[in-house]
């Protein structure tokens, strides 16, 4: 009888521990393998890339979309923030915080505009800040864009409003309610701030609601 009871108790404990194991298995980091490097070389990892391959990490995570579906996501970032991002995405996953899409920007030929238009969340991409000759923090894998279509980059110049991506104009008015919107104080904002990231929505001369970066 004791053996039977012990068996069922063991099964019960295993079942209770299963969600944590699944959660742990769904969130991993690794060095950039040859297969991944072949995928990004000449795209996000351009020929003039100054960030060493050894400084980058490939992340695999789980995330929900607004319809409650669980999706597999992937992202490349700098090794110094890999653990931070895994912790952040684990917490977002536990809370069922919606992220529509998370694929390597290379699936869009490293075209930031195309990736944003598809509402693709991403990190590493060796490129310049839009409209400047300065390298973006994305070039080092030290910045992350979350749900970029619904959280656009907005700049006002000479009476004109510049919005990126170009199809994000309906989401410039942050008083409106719509899915995937990041607002100051929400879970996504709080988690990134907890791990020392700065939010583009706090900028004064422009707003980049999708953007979190770390120094």
Where are these regions (language model features)?
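Bacterial Sec-dependent N-terminal signal peptides
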Residues: 1-21
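N-terminal module-boundary/linker segments of secreted carbohydrate-active enzymes
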Residues: 21-69
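Active-site acidic/histidine clusters and adjacent loop/turn architecture
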Residues: 51-116
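Extracellular/periplasmic catalytic domains that process cell-envelope and extracellular macromolecules
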Residues: 52-55, 135-141, 191
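Structured segments of extracytoplasmic/periplasmic soluble domains
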Residues: 64, 84-98, 127, 149-152, ...
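Second-shell loop/turn segments in exported
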Residues: 70-79, 132, 173-180
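Mid-length scaffold segments of soluble, non-membrane domains
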Residues: 99-100, 114-148
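Catalytic cores and adjacent binding grooves of peptidoglycan-active enzymes
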Residues: 129, 141-215
């Amino acid at each position: 009888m004791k053996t039977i009871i012990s068996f069922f108790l063991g099964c019960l404990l295993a079942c209770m521990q299963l969600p944590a194991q699944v959660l742990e298995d769904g969130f991993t980091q690794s060095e950039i393998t040859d297969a991944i490097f072949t995928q990004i070389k000449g795209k996000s990892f351009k020929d003039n890339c100054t960030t060493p391959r050894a400084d980058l990490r490939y992340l695999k995570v789980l995330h929900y979309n607004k319809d409650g579906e669980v999706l597999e996501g992937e992202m490349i970032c700098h090794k110094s923030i890999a653990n931070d991002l895994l912790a952040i995405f684990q917490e977002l996953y536990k809370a069922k915080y919606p992220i529509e899409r998370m694929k390597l920007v290379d699936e869009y030929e490293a075209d930031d505009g195309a990736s944003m238009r598809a509402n693709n969340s991403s990190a590493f991409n060796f490129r310049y800040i839009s409209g400047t000759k300065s390298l973006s923090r994305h070039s080092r894998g030290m910045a992350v864009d979350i749900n970029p279509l619904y959280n656009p980059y907005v700049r006002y110049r000479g009476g004109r409003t510049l919005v990126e991506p170009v199809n994000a104009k309906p989401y410039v008015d942050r008083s409106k309610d719509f899915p995937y919107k990041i607002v100051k104080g929400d879970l996504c904002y709080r988690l990134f701030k907890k791990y020392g990231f700065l939010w583009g929505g706090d900028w004064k001369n422009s707003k980049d609601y999708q953007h979190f970066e770390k120094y």
